């Protein structure tokens, strides 16, 4: 077993031991924890671009991310529309409003923080929506992501000969990409044999096709983050997890997979 694979395995074990009990419990603790993870992910992206979070604009970006992530509709019940939409829109409007009164903060400056708050906040919000729908649905998504990552890594390491996206991620191969898809389909079939109700109203054959799509989406999410890191000239998104980089290095695929599963009506 290579050192990199040992690190991946160790992280997976620790993540399962810490994250899964909180995920299983759900509720406010999970919502706050995921909201803080989302804020940390946006902090990493702002830091990549050289933007400071200890500013009015930076704070607004972090609060907007938190507002989009947690299910505010459960707490702002007096509003006639979704609480997330209202809170996020208000904070983004304030952020745009600062461009009116500041000579050094333009619409172009505001565009990147707004984009990353939406990208990260929407992904983590979908994770919380999945948990509300059922613990098994979150597990299915996580297993698809982890199976894709592990199968792609092992297949690419042993059989990878053709580069997938050399400009963005030189180490990824087409063989690994295909291996990741097969790994996701296999874990989905096994999961549904154990829990046949997780993907209702879809059966195992259609879910196998969906799993292939989710695997592609997850690997695309990985490439998106790789492209951003290469653009900004950094190796990792952050240093939150020693030896593993930042939050986005671990959650990049999930930020795409969870919204896609929601789009397909799985929760």
Language-model regions, residue ranges each:
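Membrane-embedded alpha-helical bundles of polytopic integral membrane proteins
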Residues: 1-173, 177-212
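Hydrophobic alpha-helical transmembrane segments of integral membrane proteins
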Residues: 17-18, 238, 255-256
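Hydrophobic transmembrane alpha-helical segments of multi-pass transport and channel proteins
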Residues: 215-220, 247-255
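Interfacial loop-to-transmembrane junctions
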Residues: 7, 230-252
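Juxtamembrane boundary at the C-terminal end of a transmembrane helix
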Residues: 262-267
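Generic detector of well-ordered alpha-helical packing
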Residues: 9, 45, 150, 223-226, ...
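C-terminal transmembrane helix pair
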Residues: 228-229, 252-261
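Short helical (or helix-break) motifs at transmembrane helix termini and adjacent helical loops
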Residues: 147-157, 218-230
């Amino acid at each position: 077993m290579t050192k990199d694979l040992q690190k991946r395995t160790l992280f997976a074990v620790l993540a399962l031991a810490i994250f899964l009990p909180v995920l299983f419990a759900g509720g406010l603790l999970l919502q706050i924890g995921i909201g803080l993870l989302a804020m940390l992910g946006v902090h990493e992206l702002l830091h990549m671009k050289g933007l400071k979070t200890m500013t009015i604009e930076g704070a607004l970006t972090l609060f907007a991310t938190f507002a989009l992530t947690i299910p505010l509709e459960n707490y702002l019940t007096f509003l006639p529309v979704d609480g997330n939409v209202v809170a996020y829109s208000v904070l983004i409007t304030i952020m745009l409003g600062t461009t009116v009164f500041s000579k050094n903060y333009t619409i172009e400056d505001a565009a990147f923080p707004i984009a990353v708050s939406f990208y990260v906040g929407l992904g983590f919000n979908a994770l919380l929506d999945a948990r509300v729908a059922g613990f098994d649905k979150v597990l299915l998504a996580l297993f698809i992501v982890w199976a894709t990552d592990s199968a792609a890594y092992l297949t690419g390491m042993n059989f990878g000969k053709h580069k997938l996206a050399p400009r963005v991620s030189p180490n990824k191969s087409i063989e690994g990409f295909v291996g990741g898809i097969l790994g996701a389909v296999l874990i989905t079939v096994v999961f549904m044999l154990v829990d046949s109700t997780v993907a209702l109203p879809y059966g195992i054959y259609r879910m196998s096709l969906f799993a292939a799509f989710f695997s592609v989406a997850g690997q695309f999410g990985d490439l998106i983050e790789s492209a951003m890191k290469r653009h900004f000239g950094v190796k990792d998104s952050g240093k939150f997890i020693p030896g593993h980089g930042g939050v986005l290095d671990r959650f990049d695929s999930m930020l795409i997979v969870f919204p896609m599963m929601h789009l397909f009506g799985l929760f």
